[in-house]
Structure formats: C-alpha cells, structure tokens
Amino acid sequence: MKRISIYIGLCMMLICTCLPAFAGPEAEFRKLEKHYTLRADGSQELRVRKELTLYTHAAMNGLYGETFITYDPAFQELQIHQSYTQQKDGTIVKTPDNAFVEVLPSVAADAPAYNRLKEMVVVHTGLELGATIYLDYSIISKPGYLPALDVCCPVRELSPIKEFICTIETEKSPLLHYELLNYDAPAKRMDTRNNRQCVQWTLRNVSPRPYNYPTQHDRLSLIQEAASGMQPVIVATTHTSYAEALKTLRAQFVPGDEAVIKEKVTELAVGAEGDKQKLRDAIGQYMMYRYSRLGNISLKLADTGYRLRPASEVLRSGYGTTAELVNLDVCLQRAAGLEADIVICALRASKTDNVGLSGIVSVFARSGDMAMRVPLSGTAEADLQEYMMITDLSGNSVELENKWTEHARTYYTFEADDKRIRTLEGGIRLVKAEGKDMALILSDNYAKNTEIDAPVLLPMKYDHTFVTTVKLPEGMTWVRKSGREIVNACGKVVFTYEQAENAIKVTCRLVVNQQLLTPSSYPDFYALMREWKDENNYLLLFTPEAI
C-alpha cells in the first residue's frame, strides 16, 4: 500500500511539472488614464498616468521594462510628474535620474530633417514579480503647433486593464465631436469651474487584445482591428468638420521650388522621346526607389505635427515620410502633364465629422496612367475600402478599383522535360501543380489556429482559379485521382483533374467571400484553408507504362 502511495505521489508530481506554471496575464494595468486638454491659447496637453503590476519575467524584462515617449522639443515639452516602482513588500524605488535616457527615435535616424525629434526611454527600476510601476507624465504642445485637438486612442492593451479613463477637456467653443467605437459605454459630460467642458469615459475590466492578432499592413492594422470590432477606439476632434480638417492638411501638400521639380522631370524625360507612357514609367521607377526603405522614413503624420516639407526639399534630400513622398510623386506627375491626385484613408465612425486628422491611416498617390513594372499603389486600401473612409484632400468620396472583385484566372504549363518534374525511385515522376503558395497571405497569416477568440477582418475577399497543364512525359501513365470540393458559408475550395490528349489539367479554385470572421464563422474559413494547404491536392504521379 505504501509503495502504491509513493507511485501515486510521483505521478502527481510529474503531472504538476507538465502543467503551465502561470495561466494568468503577463501583467495588469490597475489604472490607465489619458487626459487630453486644449487650452484657450491653443496649447495642448496629453497627460498619461499608469499603474502597472507585473506578474512574469517576460513582462518585467521585455514587454514593460521600459516606457518610450516620443516628442518634438522644438514645439513640445515633456514633463515627468512621477515615476517609481512599488515592490511587493511595499518598498518604494524611485526612478533615478540616469534611468531617464533621451535618444533619437530609430525611425528618424537616417533623416536629418527630423533629427530634432527625441525619444525619452524611461528605464523602470526595482522591478520584481508582483511589483507595480507608477508613471505620470505630460507632453505639452506649444500654441499653433497642432491645428486642432485631435484624438485617436485605441483602448485595449496586451494586458487587462482594471480601470481605463479617457478625459477630453476643451473650451466650450469650438464644438467637440467625439465617439467611442466598438464599446457600449456612454460619455460623461461635465462643466468645469472655469467655464470649460469635459467629456469622460470610464471603462472597467477591459480584456487584453490578442497577442498575435493578425493584420496585413502596419499602416492599415488599426483599420482591421477597429473594423472587426476587436479594438475599441476613442476618436475626437475640435475641427468643425472632417473636410475642414483635411483643408489644414491640404495646405501642406505644396511643390515648393517648382524649378527643382521641373528639372527632375526633364532629367527623367531623357529617353522617353516624347512618349507619355515612357515618361510615366520613368517617374514610376524613380518613385518606386524612393518609396522603398532606402528613402521612406516611417514617421506618421502625428509624429511631425501634421506638417510636410515641400516636394522640392524632399527631392533634394532623397528621403521623406510617406506623405511627403506621395506629395513628391503627385508633383512630378503633374509637372509632366500627367493626371494624379492624393487619396486619404481614415477610420470610419458613425458620423464623418467625429474623425479628425489623427484618424488618418494611409495616404497614397492615385494616377490616371499606370506605370509599367511598378507596384500599383492603393491596392491594400482598395481591398478594405468598405471598412474605412476614403476621400481626396477636399473630403470628396473616392472609390478605388478592387482587383479582387472579379474572378481571376492564372495559367501555368509544364512541358514534359520541365525541371519542376521530379524523378523518383523506379522511374516514377512527381509534379506539383501551382496555386498553393499564391494564397499564403490568407492561409499562413489568418489560419494558424483552429479557433479564434476575437473577430478578425481579412485583408481581402478572394476568388482566384489556378490552372496547371502538365504535358505527359513520353512513356508515362498518369495515376488518376478524384477531385475535391468544399463549399460552406465562407466560400469554397475546388480541385479538379482532367486528362485531355497528351496532357493533364489541374484546376484549383479558392473563393473567400466573407471578409469579417467571427469566432462562430471562423471554422468554415479554417476548413477552406486546411483543404487549400493540403499538399496532396497539388501532386500528380506518373508511372512508367511498363509498370
């Protein structure tokens, strides 16, 4: 009996060692507060207070060990009101002076025009499991630096939040437009003693956002997060309208020294011989190089105070933010007598005027003439256009051409001596039809798990057929196989195999007609992707006729 008890005890110990050591969150925000203030003189203040308790070494050493605060000292002042750590036993460890490290933001490292930007790295000290970080700081913007009060504040963090408070304080005039997206919590309106108005949201027990939430493009990730319903977002602005907000931005899109622009167009026109299409191609090739990482500085509009350098200055410097490069692109095309304009993409709210400049997620150039051998701009935006606002700089709605709206077909042909036909032992030939890798954007990024906990917005709908024709190698016989078809509410997957004369034709079709996936509809999408990724559906076997 004693021996049995020992065995049982050993088994329990083994089971315990196999169980996860920690099933809770990495950390927890006891309180996260953001207070936006617009003063009568036009200056603004963003005050952030956070109380964050750490539960794991990953949170302590990586995720929350440092806080990064970017600001522009030419127009903004950073004030650290309080920074300390309260250890588990109650001991207070104040952040020492040498733990406030001011550096150049990495995104501005190769851009002398933006080397004035600073990033304050607050290195939290005295950390241990169970410790709580307290940080309270303000970024104060000088009058005139920002055109209006503009708020775009995602709520959910990677860790749960016990209490989230967002307050917006302004003069009673101009009117404040505001909205909380994807969360049912009314705003509390308050009048302060000094004849000002406050709007405040208090959200409790906010669940964390998924750690590996799938999005396709950094610039459009907020669209996918918000439009899916996963991410609550507070938007607010004192601009009288969205069109008025764009008017202030439109004033930044200027050519500057037009002689510099025309000189560049003349240089690019060499070899075009007066051919309009060749000139468009030359401009497209030049801008493709500029849009690459070599010339594109990953600063957002808000990082530069919604200000742009003139196109001529961007041309001379050889680099620019995305918005600056778009301005240069359009200026070059217009100087060459080509048609081009600027397209603005922003978050969609229930009322257009609730969104200001901070809600802009993408800016790109739309051309009347397509450049050859150059990626078409705005394709990712076109795939998501029903989930965001798309306008020109005057606020007029813009409809983008969507390349996935119609059924597309791609054809491949393998000759009998094609190097892609592998020879196996016994003279057996193996061929892999095309198509599987063409939908990696969906199958690899959005079908990693068998289920999801939060809604997911796919980057596109999809309808594409891939036809591979394989010429029969001489003296070989095709090993017949049956077709496959799955049809459900999300779309369909079809594989057919036909023999005609001296060839085998493999037809693979993938249709995904449901872009917004919920936890209940996701299994249908996963079933399609699982079938589409099955290697066996693409393989053809040929055996020697003598076998």
Where in the sequence are the language-model features?
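Bacterial N-terminal signal peptides
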Residues: 9-18
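A sensor for short, sequence-defined functional sites
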Residues: 23-547
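Positively charged n-region of N-terminal signal peptides that target proteins for export
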Residues: 1-4
